[in-house]
């Protein structure tokens, strides 16, 4: 299939062995009950094979809705999927799954969420420091805190659990371009933080790319960079 025929949100591409593996939120089940993730495979980023189901909830997984933003990272020779999940009686959070192949099957690796159990969190990504220490960088949702946050939290060497408390990197309102938005369900206003991704420049500066709303767009705007410092 062609790239424009793929119906996903939150795309993430893993490159491995000369191929591109595209993961994302299923468009058809984005806002309601969900049971898995798919992967598409390409050699040119235009023509794709798939979808191939790479994770499926057989009824034993803890979450049943809002399967969002899967990212797959290779770390110490293994593949790890970081994704956001939700259940009605539980806060949204990032859980970690693992597989031996980019096509899966991915299976639960962390014991539920690795983000704080009483925080509404999403869009967790993996950052590995120059001294090989893994961190989860994630968004603390604006629907809970008002002024959305990007936080970082150290992970165990096997990526199965958090080994420290979250550290605030910045608030959404610190960006001059961020626009206040209204949440219809709660009736509150706030600043959104979504989709963090860490990037180090050639000069060694560590940047966080992230998304929110701005006056430049009627709705969602493109990623912007926020300088965090040389290390977390």
What does each model-identified segment do?
Residues 39-44, 96-100:
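Short beta-strand segments and strand-loop junctions that repeat across beta-rich extracellular domains
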Residues 9-31, 52-54, 68-89, 125-129, ...:
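Hydrophobic core segments of beta-strands in well-ordered, beta-rich domains
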Residues 36-38, 95, 151:
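A short loop-to-beta-strand structural motif that recurs across blades of beta-propeller domains
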Residues 79-82, 99, 103-112, 133-135, ...:
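Short secondary-structure capping/junction motifs at helix and strand boundaries
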Residues 221-228:
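Conserved small/polar residues in nucleotide/adenosyl-binding loops
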Residues 87, 92-94, 98:
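A generic tandem-repeat structural signature
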Residues 28, 35-40:
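Short Gly/aromatic-enriched secondary-structure transition segments
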Residues 1-15, 29-32, 46-74, 105-128, ...:
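Surface loop/turn signatures of beta-propeller and other carbohydrate-active proteins
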């Amino acid at each position: 299939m062609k790239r424009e025929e793929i119906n996903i949100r939150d795309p993430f591409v893993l490159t491995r062995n000369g191929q591109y593996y595209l993961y994302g939120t299923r468009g058809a089940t984005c806002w309601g009950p969900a049971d898995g993730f798919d992967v598409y495979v390409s050699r040119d980023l235009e023509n794709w094979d798939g979808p191939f189901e790479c994770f499926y909830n057989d009824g034993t997984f803890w979450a049943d809705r809002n399967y969002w933003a899967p990212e797959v990272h290779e770390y110490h020779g293994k593949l790890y999927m970081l994704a956001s999940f939700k259940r009605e009686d539980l806060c949204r959070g990032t859980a970690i799954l693992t597989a031996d192949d980019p096509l899966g099957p991915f299976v639960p690796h962390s014991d539920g969420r690795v983000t704080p159990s009483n925080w509404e969190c999403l869009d967790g990504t993996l950052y590995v420091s120059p001294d090989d220490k893994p961190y989860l960088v994630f968004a603390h949702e604006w629907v809970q805190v008002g002024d959305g946050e990007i936080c970082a939290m150290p992970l165990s060497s096997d990526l199965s659990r958090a080994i420290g408390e979250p550290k605030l990197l910045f608030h959404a309102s610190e960006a001059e371009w961020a626009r206040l938005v209204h949440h219809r369900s709660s009736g509150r206003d706030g600043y959104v933080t979504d989709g963090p991704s860490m990037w180090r420049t050639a000069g060694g500066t560590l940047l966080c790319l992230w998304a929110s709303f701005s006056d430049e767009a009627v709705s969602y705007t493109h990623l912007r960079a926020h300088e965090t410092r040389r290390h977390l």
